[in-house]
Amino acid sequence: MNRRRFLQQAAIAFPLAAAAVRGVSARALDANASVVIVGAGLAGLRTADLLHKAGVPVIVLEARAFPGGRVLTVRAPFDDGLHAEAGPTRFAGAHAAVLRAARAYKLPLVPLAASGADVTAVNGRPASTLQGQRAWMLDLKRDEQMTTPAELLDRYVGELPRELGDPRAPQSAFARWEAYERLTWPEWLRSRGASPDAVRLMTVGGDSSGVSALYVLRQYAMLRASTQRYKIGGGMDRLPGAMAASLSGIIRYNAPVVRVERQSTGFRVDYREGAVRSIAAARVVFAVPASTMRQIEMKPRLSRLKEQAIEQLSYYDGVRFLIQVKRPFWKAAGFSGSARTDRATEIWDAATEQTASSRGILAATTGGEMGRRTLGMTPDASLSLGVDLIADAFPGIRSEFEKGASYRWSTEPWTRGAFALYRPGQMTTLMPVLASAESGLHFAGEHTSIWTGWMEGALESGERAAREVLNATGRSWPEQTGATR
């Protein structure tokens, strides 16, 4: 879900940066901090907020010119003040850390309650009713026929989430879940007796072909009782914006970290801010994706297990399409604007609460093989593909199209992917290693949390990293933070 202004930003050549660092070893440090935090996404901002409130001297180094990481609200090129999300679009009622943060910064919570029928499109044929699904001509077993994808999912998952126990259990409990992640999600559904076409229906809307079954089951279990979804009024980027504003003078933008060296008194952190500059720190918190960690030179190197985990973790090749239309034409036909298709695409009304304009925006996300198809495309060709994908569910978009944008996360230089993608066998092996501290080095980000892929995961991991630092340094947890100690 390549969500950002990165199409206007040039990537800094990391190999050149690393080479330049080697020539500045004798130069004096330009600052000191007890803790340097790498990355001003939600994880880094939350870590910085808690440490700052606890009285810890902190400096945050951010490669981009703005905070938020993968939280990106797009306002251009849309008309009438419309906006849409190129990053996270929603969060759940179960996401306590996001709700706490939004309320702490007095940001408006907008419940998502679109009216109208949802659409599922298979074989290029959209349907919003069970009767309409007959046009799909699928080879389903008798007891699978005339059943919605959600009903099929409930049938084949059954009581299994309860068998998993507490899905929020600490990572030390992963061992008992190993049996659930030996297969991919589609393979696991087939092992439960689902027909191939039933599996196809249960996996519309995304590419789960390489995803660990445990990854999906834990998400399913944690969200099962939480049906309400929210977004932040005025744009999701208001949350990192408010958090960053409260940390004035602490964050340095356009300052990508290129090297971290352990020294006798702590660490030296080298970053580019025009020339290469350095900061001395007692501890370092890496609040960046594993894909970004691969670009930072570590001296000495991290542990073998940590290096392997960072190298092996995959990221979803997500692409986000944001399409402005003359009017929200789907509403007149009784549709909500939400749809899932068998071309690994999820679609939704991105401007449902923005009633000041007569226009509308349909957003769509695709990924996996379909997302990789966009890598060699021009922006216009990518946008055209987005319209085609949405037309599978809402054919009227072709005549209503005005303008739009596409965002390819896998080409964003500071992310290289939409969110962490755990493959079979990796959640029980990689995640505990990725989240563990190493002698003054701490690690945060959605990829280290049970809420992988959500803003909740980023905030939660930031709280964990801050807790590690405070415990290690004997400092007290800051009061009135709303976080769990």
List where the protein language model places each region:
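FAD-dinucleotide binding site
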Residues: N2-R485
